[in-house]
Amino acid sequence: MRLPWNIMQREAQPRASEPAARVEERSEFALSVRNLSTVFEDGSKTVHAVRDVSFDMRPTERLGVVGESGSGKSALALSILGLIEPPGKVLGGEILLDGRDIAKLSDRQLSAVRGKDIALVLQDPMSALDPVKTIGSQIVEAVVAHEPQLRRSAARKRAAELLREVDIPQAERRLDDYPHQYSGGMRQRVAIAIAIANNPRVLIADEPTTALDVTTQSQVLGLLDRLVEQHRTAVILITHNLGVVSDFCDSVAVMYAGRFVETSGVDHVFLNPTHPYSEALLKCVPNPERLAEGPLPAITGFPPDLAQLPGGCSFAPRCPVGREVAQCHEQAPRPHHVATASGPAEVECHFAEQRSAQVKV
């Protein structure tokens, strides 16, 4: 996902209505999303990018959101942050940050929340950083945006502390460098430093390690792991890399055609997935122990057109279980709550109960 470098500072797009949000009592959840739906309208077509998504996150929880390209992962992140641009719009739903529905905030109120209580780390740090400003000035800008009374000298000191916190050596000196003078991994560390500058309750990381080599990827994940514990931050990690999810996350949401089709703990999804799509995704991951079994399997067919969704289950035309089952093509599955050896799971599949008891991977 490539966005302008100053996206976290800009005003949100106008919403249909902007009543003052009612402040709720502090919730046990850092973030609760209820029935969130987002569409993109293009002439006669309406693309349903996010469809009735709900989930909860406690402080320090790490949720991995996985799925094929076009499944709605980045649209979900932008919807939560209030950064959907026309022709897109959030149709409805609640986004409760510490019990406060930020979906009802005005533009000005949302700008005060974004970057302070909820923050974003992008896939490409060069898109997130202004190439003509020093690293120090950009971190200072992020700090004083939410603490305008802070003296510039104190903000610069805080910027150096943040660079040290993300393991950048010679922090004081590196404040005066420009983004092109940093390596890719160090730029990603700077992006993380800016995101945590105001101790957000929730951090959304959209493919933060995709452009990094394996060693740097491991270092960045270790850094995020440490920051989660220090700041008690809940993290939504959006990625194609199932190995990263396995190493870093507590829970996994498998997204397909704009919906969460399976949500559970990491152990369950990786060791014994219930939804056929989750199982198919895992079988596409290279496994040295299965090299002798033949070519790497691929999921047959293509994801559905989100402007012309099929009736019934969206995965049915590609599903090895439901492809020939009339019910799967005619009736959309409801969420099933199933018990697994590693905890509860929520699965949108007509065969969820039967499949939850089977060993598949």
What are the residue ranges of the model-derived segments?
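Charged, flexible cofactor/metal-binding loops and thiol motifs
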Residues: 26-29, 265-361
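P-loop NTP-binding/switch modules centered on Walker-like glycine-rich loops
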Residues: 68, 82, 108, 204-208, ...
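Conserved ABC transporter NBD signature motif
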Residues: 90-101
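Conserved ABC ATPase "signature" region
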Residues: 100-101, 141, 154-173, 282-283
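Conserved ABC ATPase signature
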Residues: 177-182, 186
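A short, proline-enriched helix->beta-strand linker immediately N-terminal to the Walker B motif
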Residues: 197-201
